[in-house]
């Protein structure tokens, strides 16, 4: 894996009452185009139940972290280790979704002594296939276009309506059921739009990711990440949605080569974003694993 200059990551911290400072803290790592906010109150619940300090970070080119032209999934490993060094974290528990899961996987394999346990949400150990990268590229592009069409000063309902209508009108029919669409688009009328945004000085909404850098990286799937290598023998939990594109039967042999002590939990009624679709079931699975 090539070496990259790390960037400063934004984060939020949860310190539970009665925090046990002798226990390694927990770090939550989001997926592509998400942010630290999209873990909702799960970091608080897990921190309070385990009496461990918890962090939720924004990856580079996401949320409030530094934006840079350099971006691929390998960069995130260097950024995570830099963050741990800056915060004085010798060892941590990693709970990570999708792209963040790949960060956790590669970190655990690279420096297993710095990872006590890991929870991987709805991603395997293999690089994403080109077909999936194409889907993600389409969705990032359409989402960004939709955000740009939102009128300045619009309320939340107008924002949601404008973006979803633009995507719906322009999304190829064969992509309507893909995991990225499922991840971001509301499933019910009162659902929140799972897209990180901010309001600029002109009142216009902006995608809270570095769109040019991410789209440029997605143009070259073969260089998006190097293949994971090594063995992590400590406890590992792979959580997946039973409605997602993750197929345990086909992925388990690849996972077990690198993570021989991996356990698997499938969550009913969950798509790619298990922690958003079924937060109670996700949190219960995480706590059971951490408290074993």
Language-model regions, residue ranges each:
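Flexible "cap/lid" loop of the alpha/beta hydrolase fold
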Residues: 109, 116-159
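Conserved serine/cysteine hydrolase catalytic core
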Residues: 188-257, 263-266
